[in-house]
């Protein structure tokens, strides 16, 4: 009996051992004796950089970028240790701001901020959401070498010292999260974020180290400045396994090595049907669809991917309407409409082409709201019908291979004979 999450609910599936291609999740890794000491030691031994306390001067202002509710990074446990380092250099709390790098996600509510950052931090330093559409709080700094406009949060740019804190996970289309990603798309403007995502719209990039999006992020960071990063690798319970700090490129590459150790999971047989459970990252389809790209790497061409992701907030709170409209068009038409400036939400265009890539190569089935599923032109299956469907497919094909990926938004399947 295979147990798999659909949100917090556990579904039990009877998949014969001879038909099970794989049943995988992120690799188990020893948890440090002290999570806080792991973080503290990382700050004491940064990679490619001086210690943070040796970078800042007592009269300087500091902005800390932290991720939002769609990421599991324990900001409430990391930031206090970073503050210790800043305070030891003579920085006062009123010289520090935390900007939540929401990218184009919706702003976090006060309750969500308290849950992720803690009431103590909220009382200690100023914490605010980035707003990618508030042009009064953005600055245009020209273009990158690829021509992407450098539009960035004004308060971030005006700070003397800028620190990014985030997590390391496989990510499409960037390859891996972490590093300069906290800056772009984290605190960039709408056009900048959209153009970056369009760079990786049509090719599978999950788990790659050098990608067009990653290069653009790092060019962007080189232009506007990102003095220090703190990146963590976590287990499925949100415990910090490894912390890497320092230069936004050199430290990030070291962190990615650890990411491969934890999230790179070997399998030896491709599946005809892959069940991809995204729990706990299943807020909306623009987050849950990461489980499609993970499953792509483990599914036979022309096979089926079934995404188990409730997506309680629908397609995407800030991009859903445009994504729903664009679902009727192929990539050529979307590129044509972009060229003719017929699409205002360019990020939604990138997301739509990501999904077109999956639909072109696989039968893609969603276990979420049936209306949204239909609008997005995916196949639909309910949680109550999944077992019957698998039984039916097994009766038709006794050699059918079924694979299961748990917490699929953080798994990088790696084929190994």
Explain the meaning of each model-derived region.
Residues 71-91, 288-299:
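Histidine-anchored nucleotide/phosphate-binding helix
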Residues 108-176:
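An acidic, phosphate/nucleotide-engaging active-site surface
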Residues 207-281:
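Membrane-embedded hairpin module used as a gating/binding unit in multi-pass transport
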Residues 61-72, 97-103, 274-277:
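Short glycine-rich or small-residue beta-strand-to-loop segments that form or flank ligand, phosphate
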Residues 145-208, 217:
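Divalent-metal (Mg2+/Mn2+/Ca2+)-assisted nucleotide/phosphate chemistry catalytic cores
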């Amino acid at each position: 009996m295979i147990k798999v999450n659909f949100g917090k609910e556990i579904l039990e599936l009877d998949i014969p051992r001879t038909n099970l291609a794989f049943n995988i999740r992120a690799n188990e890794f020893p948890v440090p004796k002290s999570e806080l000491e792991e973080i503290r030691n990382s700050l004491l031994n940064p990679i490619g950089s001086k210690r943070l306390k040796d970078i800042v001067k007592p009269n300087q202002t500091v902005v800390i970028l932290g991720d939002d509710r769609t990421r599991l990074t324990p900001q409430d446990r990391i930031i206090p240790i970073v503050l210790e380092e800043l305070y030891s250099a003579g920085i006062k709390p009123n010289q520090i701001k935390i900007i939540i790098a929401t990218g184009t996600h919706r702003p976090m509510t006060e309750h969500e901020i308290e849950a992720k950052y803690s009431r103590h931090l909220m009382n200690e330093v100023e914490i605010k959401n980035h707003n990618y559409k508030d042009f009064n709080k953005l600055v245009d700094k020209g273009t990158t070498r690829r021509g992407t406009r450098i539009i960035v949060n004004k308060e971030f740019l005006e700070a003397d010292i800028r620190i990014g804190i985030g997590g390391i996970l496989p990510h499409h289309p960037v390859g891996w999260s972490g590093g300069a990603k906290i800056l772009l798309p984290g605190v960039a403007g709408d056009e900048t974020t959209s153009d970056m995502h369009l760079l990786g719209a049509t090719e599978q990039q999950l788990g790659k180290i050098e990608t067009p999006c990653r290069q653009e992020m790092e060019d962007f960071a080189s232009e506007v400045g990102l003095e220090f990063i703190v990146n963590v690798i976590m287990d499925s319970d949100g415990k910090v396994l490894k912390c890497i700090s320092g230069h936004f490129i050199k430290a990030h590459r070291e962190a990615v090595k650890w990411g491969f150790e934890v999230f790179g999971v070997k399998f030896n047989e491709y599946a005809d049907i892959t069940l991809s459970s995204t729990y706990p990252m299943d807020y909306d389809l623009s987050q849950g669809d990461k489980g499609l790209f993970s499953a792509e790497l483990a599914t036979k061409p022309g096979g089926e991917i079934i995404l188990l992701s409730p997506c309680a907030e629908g397609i995407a709170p800030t991009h859903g309407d445009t994504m729903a409209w664009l679902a009727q068009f192929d990539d050529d038409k979307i590129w044509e409409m972009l060229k003719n400036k017929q699409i205002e939400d360019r990020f939604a265009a990138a997301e739509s082409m990501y999904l077109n890539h999956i639909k072109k190569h696989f039968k893609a089935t969603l276990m979420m709201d049936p209306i949204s599923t239909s609008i997005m032109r995916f196949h639909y299956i309910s949680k109550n019908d999944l077992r019957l469907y698998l039984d039916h497919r097994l009766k038709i094909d006794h050699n059918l291979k079924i694979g299961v990926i748990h917490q699929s938004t953080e798994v990088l399947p790696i084929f190994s004979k």
